[in-house]
Regions:
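Actinobacteria-biased recognition of intrinsically disordered, low-complexity terminal regions
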Residues: 1-6, 27, 200
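C-terminal peripheral helix-coil segments that are non-catalytic and often amphipathic
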Residues: 122, 150-200
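Hydrophobic alpha-helical connector segments
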Residues: 64-110, 134
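Amphipathic alpha-helical packing segments from all-alpha helical-bundle domains
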Residues: 81-82, 100-136, 142, 156-166
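Short, basic, alpha-helical segments at the C-terminal edge of helix-turn-helix-like DNA-binding modules
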Residues: 57-61
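Helix-turn-helix
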Residues: 7, 11, 15-53
Length: 200
């Protein structure tokens, strides 16, 4: 049975979950598929081409959370939904945020961004304000998810835990802000509040 491009991408994502991005190689992927490494070049020009496709697939398959905004919903509802969906797409795979940061945008991504820019400009944002808002939001989602995944990948047993005994306020604040979902939602709200303020 002939190997399809999609089969290679799926195997790549499975291997990513097993070994992480740093240890993902075309040689290991070929072994996983039971083929010789040069065969992969029939489907992808190079490793970067494969990583781009893996990232695009992970994002395309991201769970929409069952709460897709209704047509005509306000711009901030759409941006919040988009941010959460991107985060879920990255969290669905080990090193998903690292994969996203190492990949180039898929061609259809530009059409998606164009639609968001149109929506934001209709809401009253300038072209520059709309683009900066999208960039800030995207960088926030990528950065917080990257930190969340890297923290999860660290060997907590070997890590030296700080002693906050002498700093009770810091200790309480760290514990109170520990939940990654609540932390993400707080930052998301701050960004959207800042964008709303630009329209006032």
């Amino acid at each position: 049975m002939a190997l399809a491009r999609e089969d290679v991408v799926r195997a790549g994502l499975r291997l990513l979950d097993e070994v992480g991005l740093d240890n993902l190689s075309l040689r290991k992927l070929a072994k996983e598929l039971g083929i010789q490494a040069p065969t992969l070049y029939w489907h992808f020009k190079n490793k970067q081409d494969l990583l781009d496709e893996m990232a695009a697939t992970a994002m395309a398959e991201a769970d929409d959370g069952g709460s897709v905004p209704e047509p005509g919903a306000e711009w901030d509802c759409w941006l919040a939904w988009m941010a959460r969906r991107i985060r879920r797409g990255m969290l669905a795979h080990r090193d998903g945020a690292l994969l996203a940061s190492a990949s180039r945008p898929a061609e259809d991504r530009w059409e998606y961004v164009e639609g968001i820019l149109v929506m934001l400009q209709k809401a009253g944002f300038t072209p520059a304000g709309a683009m900066r808002g999208i960039g800030t939001l995207t960088n926030y989602v990528l950065g917080t998810t990257l930190e969340e995944q890297q923290a999860a990948n660290r060997d907590d047993e070997e890590a030296e835990r700080p002693d906050f005994t002498a700093y009770p306020m810091l200790r309480d604040a760290v514990l109170a802000a520990a939940d990654p979902v609540a932390r993400f939602e707080h930052g998301l709200s701050l960004i959207l509040d800042g964008m709303r303020a630009q329209l006032e």
